Amino acid sequence: ITYYCENRDPDFDQKMHNVLLVYKQLSLQFDENGQFIPFSEDEQVVHVLSYDEKPGIQAIATTSEDLQPGNNHKTISRDYEYKRLGTVSLLAGIDLQTGEAIPLVKDSHNSKDYIEFLKKLDDKYPKADKIRLVLDNLKVHSSEQTRKYLATVPGRFEFVFTPKHGSWLNLIEGFFSKLTRQMLKGIRVKTKDELVQRIYKYFDEVNED
């Protein structure tokens, strides 16, 4: 038996078209040298971000010290036993015009946390500008609590939703994959707060490059 993923989104093609149109419009904002072309004075500035959550990042501690490479082993050796310290959720967006990665690390990823991220974006960009997000259809993205917040900032945000089973259309997925390979895989910490700080440090280093 082989498995496949049934397309259960009747609007899959239209939603995919909408996402790809955002990317096409974005590509036209860069010249042949890859330099961003500023908006004209009579245009509304639109900031385009790819957004997603990465929940369940485990804070894991070792129960004994790692053994450094020596005569008997050529790699770092680690005890099989470990201690779980809890999990955190990463809410993040990538500004597709500047390349800046914007993180928020929380204990959960509910409507309150999502709204906190939106407020972070609202504080970051000039008030006259529009913020366009490419994101999935997670319930918190359109919850009653989220809608109430959005009603307080009319016209500020625009959402372009990926189709169900279309996460591959969201560019931040590639960033999360890189984050896992480079930093989260095999990470050990002494406290959950240390994990949070190391995630933020990773983003700082990415944004410095």
What role is predicted for each listed range?
Residues I1-R84:
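Charge-mixed, compositionally biased segments that are often intrinsically disordered regulatory tracts
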Residues S50, A128-N137:
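Acidic beta-strand-to-loop metal/phosphate-binding motif
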Residues Y51-E53, L96, N137, K164:
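Residues immediately flanking
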Residues G70-D129:
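Electropositive, glycine- and tryptophan-enriched low-complexity nucleic-acid-binding patches
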Residues S77-Y82, A151-L171, I187-V189:
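RNase H-like polynucleotidyl transferase catalytic core
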Residues H109-N110, L133-Q145, K164-L169:
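Acidic, metal-coordinating catalytic cores used for nucleic-acid/nucleotide bond scission
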Residues D136-N137, V160-R181, D193:
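RNase H-like two-metal-ion nuclease catalytic core shared by retroviral integrases
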Residues E173-D209:
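C-terminal anion-handling pockets and recognition modules
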